Structures are given as structure tokens and as C-alpha cells.
């Protein structure tokens, strides 16, 4: 059985037409605003409905629409003082007018509430990624998924595609599987964050618009001239802004499609010479980075501009074709004025860009970003014994690691886990709750400085292991 207001072939838009009879005052166009100011407290006050409209019988005349409280032709309810003041300007010409509210007037929530069966919770929000709306529909709404998607497209002209997440994330690249519910099939899109432009294939790479605030919080800690190591870089939400503010960035991701878009985004944002991209397992990436012979193996991103705005045969919309600018989890364009955007762009252009070719990562880097909450803690073990004190110069790096925390866990539990993987204690960790991702689950970030004790602990462990083995061998020889 179809839900009210919809049918197997789509939405019955005529079911949403509402006609409201209203009393109106007919006056000449040039005097309409003067009279309206006198009667303002009595006029129609509805969202997105004008209280001054053109007279359909005479374009030179206007109708002042009264509120529902003024329902009689004698304008009962309007003070005598106001009526006399109006008569001094224009003669009273009271008429009837019908306000028509059709499908286009009603917001998404109202339409869906009318369409969906009683008891169904109306989807109240969705994530927007460029021209794509990302839904997470519960099972009881899946029967109506196509209708829901159609309404969202109708009501958001900047959107072109609506998708729904299917199942849980099981692939090695942590990319959700999506079903396209309505609109264009292409998931290649473009978004803007903090003055940077990002292109991506939403069906092939990971992106979360709700993390915009966290991206800003972290890269605000980077200073011009610093060297950043991003172990799980994705398409560059940390790497690109860091390079824009004068950092050199070593960026790695296991997903080859993410790395391709990372390189493309480096070129789009003119920071290619400041970023070196790798497509490796994160542990292998870190070990290569601190080996002098291997530290230059990655590709400088500026050499990878993809011809004709295409990637793997998929056409990528240009910034002019798709210029949706996002706020965190929002589907609204940026409210910044052109002058503000130009000023911000000029400020970015003034920053002296670091050339990655001038950096020796085996000697120093300042920050390590580990943004893979599902398993980043496990990768902390690569830092155990990683750095060579004979070659390292300057201060030890700060590690920014993301993870999940269950409701029955504490910050101390997370730090203890981290210490287990690191192989040593963490002094003064800075723990920060990023956001709640589920009723009993939160995303957490902690920052700590790697100590030389941790850097050397693996070497000392190996040293003592060899001593013990040598002792056992000698002991066995003595007893022969």
C-alpha cells in the first residue's frame, strides 16, 4: 500500500496544495510600503510568503494581505486609529484573496511527515558531499527510500545525487558501500574546506564532511616550516591545508585511488612541490621515510596533474560546474562574501611554500598524523625503535593518533592501550573527544611527544634478546 501523498510511480504533488482565503487591502503600488508600515502588526506573517503581492487584475496595484485574525471585510480587529491613518493615504478597498501553498512551499520534513506512515521517524538530516546527499536510512524506512531521495533532490537544487549507505564497512580501505537512490550515477564530486578545493570519488575513497572542524583544530597546530608525516592521508584533508600554510608533508595512504586524488588535489591547490605522496602500508611507509636511501622514494605531487580533468576514465566536474562549499555536515553554500574569500586566498598565497625536495625526513619531522580510528592505535608499534639518535636532529615529533572509545572505557584506558603498542610510557598525553559516532561510542584524538626511551626500546629489547640467546648457547656448550 502506497503511503499518503505518494504512489508507486512517484510523489503526488497535488496532494500538498493548501488554499488559504485571506482578506486583503487593494492599494496603488507606489503607496503599498507606506501603508504596510502602518498596518504591519495586522498583516500576514508566514515563512517565505509575502504580505504584499501584485494584484492579478491590475499590475499597477498591490494587495496587502491580512493575517488570519483579520477575517471580516470591515477589518474588525484593526484599531480605528490605524484605519483613519490609512484613509488619509488611500481609500479603503477591501477584497478577498487566496494564498496558495503548493508542493514547492513545504520543507523536506513536512513532505516526508505527510508521506511516511504514522510512527516512522522522519530523517532529519543528511551529510552533503559536493553534489551528493549521503543518507543512513534505518531498516523501517528502506521501503520508502526512493521517495525520500526524490523529495531531497526536489528540495535541494544544488544536489544531483542521493545515496544510502549499505551494510557495514568491511573492505580494507574503510570505504562504505553505497546504493544510488536518485539522480545522477556519478559519485565524483568537488568540495571546499578552509580555502582548499578537494575532488574525490565518494564511492572509492573515504570522506566525512562532519570532520571539518577537527581538520581545522589539528592543522592549526602546525607552524610554517614544519615537516608533517600523514600515515593515513586519504585525499588530503590534513596534508593540503598543512602545505598551504607553509609545511612540507609526507602523505601516505593504502588506497591507490585516494593517493591519485591526493596528487590531483595537490595540483589544484598549487602545493604539489610541498607534498610527497606514497601508496604503501603505513608501517612500511614510516620505515622507508627514516631510511636515507628510501626517504626519497615517494612521488612529488606536482608532477601528477591528470590530463583533461579525468581519473580512471571518470570525468571530474570542474570547480565552476560544481562549486558547492560546505560547512560541517551541512548542505548549504558558504556565506562568505567575495571580498572575504579573496582576502583569504591572498593570505594563503603570501605563505612561503616549503619544497619537499629540501627535506630529509630521516633527520627530522615535527608531527605524525594517524587518522584511522578503527586501527590507528595498533600502528603505534612502528614508532618503537624507529628513529636513529645518531642522525636525528632537533626535538622529538608530536604524534596525533585517532581512535574509538567505548562507553565503558576511560581516557586512561586508551592511553594504556597506546602505551602497550608503543612499548613505553606516554608523558602528559593530551586527550580530546572529537565527536560521538554512536550512542555508546566516541571518536577520540590524543597527542603525545615520542620519547627517546620509546625510540630506543626496540633496539634495547633486541640487544637483551641476543644476550640471552648467547648465554643459552654458551650454557649448552658447557654442559656437553
Swiss-Prot record:
GO terms for molecular function: tRNA (guanine(37)-N1)-methyltransferase activity; tRNA methyltransferase activity. GO terms for biological process: tRNA N1-guanine methylation. Keywords: Cytoplasm, Methyltransferase, Mitochondrion, Nucleus, S-adenosyl-L-methionine, Transferase, tRNA processing. Residues 334-346 have a biased composition (Basic and acidic residues). Its EC number is 2.1.1.228. Residues 312-346 are annotated as: Disordered. Its main location: mitochondrion. It comes from the Eukaryota. CDD domains: AdoMet_MTases. GO terms for cellular component: cytoplasm; mitochondrial matrix; nucleus. It catalyses: guanosine(37) in tRNA + S-adenosyl-L-methionine = N(1)-methylguanosine(37) in tRNA + S-adenosyl-L-homocysteine + H(+). Residues 312-328 have a biased composition (Polar residues). It is found in: Mitochondrion matrix; Nucleus; Cytoplasm. PANTHER family: TRNA (GUANINE(37)-N1)-METHYLTRANSFERASE, TRNA METHYLTRANSFERASE. Belongs to the class I-like SAM-binding methyltransferase superfamily. TRM5/TYW2 family. Monomer. Specifically methylates the N1 position of guanosine-37 in various cytoplasmic and mitochondrial tRNAs. Methylation is not dependent on the nature of the nucleoside 5' of the target nucleoside. This is the first step in the biosynthesis of wybutosine (yW), a modified base adjacent to the anticodon of tRNAs and required for accurate decoding. This is tRNA (guanine(37)-N(1))-methyltransferase. It comes from Physcomitrium patens (Spreading-leaved earth moss).
Amino acid at each position: 500500500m502506497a503511503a499518503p501523498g505518494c504512489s508507486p510511480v512517484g510523489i503526488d504533488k497535488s496532494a500538498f496544495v493548501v488554499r488559504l482565503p485571506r482578506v486583503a487591502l487593494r492599494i496603488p503600488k507606489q503607496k503599498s510600503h507606506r501603508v504596510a508600515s502602518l498596518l504591519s502588526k495586522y498583516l500576514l506573517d508566514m515563512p517565505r510568503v509575502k504580505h504584499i503581492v501584485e494584484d492579478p487584475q491590475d499590475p499597477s496595484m498591490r494587495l496587502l494581505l491580512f493575517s488570519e485574525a483579520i477575517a471580516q471585510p470591515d477589518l474588525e480587529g484593526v484599531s480605528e486609529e490605524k484605519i483613519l491613518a490609512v484613509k488619509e493615504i488611500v481609500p479603503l478597498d477591501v477584497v478577498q484573496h487566496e494564498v496558495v501553498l503548493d508542493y514547492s512551499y513545504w520543507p523536506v520534513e513536512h513532505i516526508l511527515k505527510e508521506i511516511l506512515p504514522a510512527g516512522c521517524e522522519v530523517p532529519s538530516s543528511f551529510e552533503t558531499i559536493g553534489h551528493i546527499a549521503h543518507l543512513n536510512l534505518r531498516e523501517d524506512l528502506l521501503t520508502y527510500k526512493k521517495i525520500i531521495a526524490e523529495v531531497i533532490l526536489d528540495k535541494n537544487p544544488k544536489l544531483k545525487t542521493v545515496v544510502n549507505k549499505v551494510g557495514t564497512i568491511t573492505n580494507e580501505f574503510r570505504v562504505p558501500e553505497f546504493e544510488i537512490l536518485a539522480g545522477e550515477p556519478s559519485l565524483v564530486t568537488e568540495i571546499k574546506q578552509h580555502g582548499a578545493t578537494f575532488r574525490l570519488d565518494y564511492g572509492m575513497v573515504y570522506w566525512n564532511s562532519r570532520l571539518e572542524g577537527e581538520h581545522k583544530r589539528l592543522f592549526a597546530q602546525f607552524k610554517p616550516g614544519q615537516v608533517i608525516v600523514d600515515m593515513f592521508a586519504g585525499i588530503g584533508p590534513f596534508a593540503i591545508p598543512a602545505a598551504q600554510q607553509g609545511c612540507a608533508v609526507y602523505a601516505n595512504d593504502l588506497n591507490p585511488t585516494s593517493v591519485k586524488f591526493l596528487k590531483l588535489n595537490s595540483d589544484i591547490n598549487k602545493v604539489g612541490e610541498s607534498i610527497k605522496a606514497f601508496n604503501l602500508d603505513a608501517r612500511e611507509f614510516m620505515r622507508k621515510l627514516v631510511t636515507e636511501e628510501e626517504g626519497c622514494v615517494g612521488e612529488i605531487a606536482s608532477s601528477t596533474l591528470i590530463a583533461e580533468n579525468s581519473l580512471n576514465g571518470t570525468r571530474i566536474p570542474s570547480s565552476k560546474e560544481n562549486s558547492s562549499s560546505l560547512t560541517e555536515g551541512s548542505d548549504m553554500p558558504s556565506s562568505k562574501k567575495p571580498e572575504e574569500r579573496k582576502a583569504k586566498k591572498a593570505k594563503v598565497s603570501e605563505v612561503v611554500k616549503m619544497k619537499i625536495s629540501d627535506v630529509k625526513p630521516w633527520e627530522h619531522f615535527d608531527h605524525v598524523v594517524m587518522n584511522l580510528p578503527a586501527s590507528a592505535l595498533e600502528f603505534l608499534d612502528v614508532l618503537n625503535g624507529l628513529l636513529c639518535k645518531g642522525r636525528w636532529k632537533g626535538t622529538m615529533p608530536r604524534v596525533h593518533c585517532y581512535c574509538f572509545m567505548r562507553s565503558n572505557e576511560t581516557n586512561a584506558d586508551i592511553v594504556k592501550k597506546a602505551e602497550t603498542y608503543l612499548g613505553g610510557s606516554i608523558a602528559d598525553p593530551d586527550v580530546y573527544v572529537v565527536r560521538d559516532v554512536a550512542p555508546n561510542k566516541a571518536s577520540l584524538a590524543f597527542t603525545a611527544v615520542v620519547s627517546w626511551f620509546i625510540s630506543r626500546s626496540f633496539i634495547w629489547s633486541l640487544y637483551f634478546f641476543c644476550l640471552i640467546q648467547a648465554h643459552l648457547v654458551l650454557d649448552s656448550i658447557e654442559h656437553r
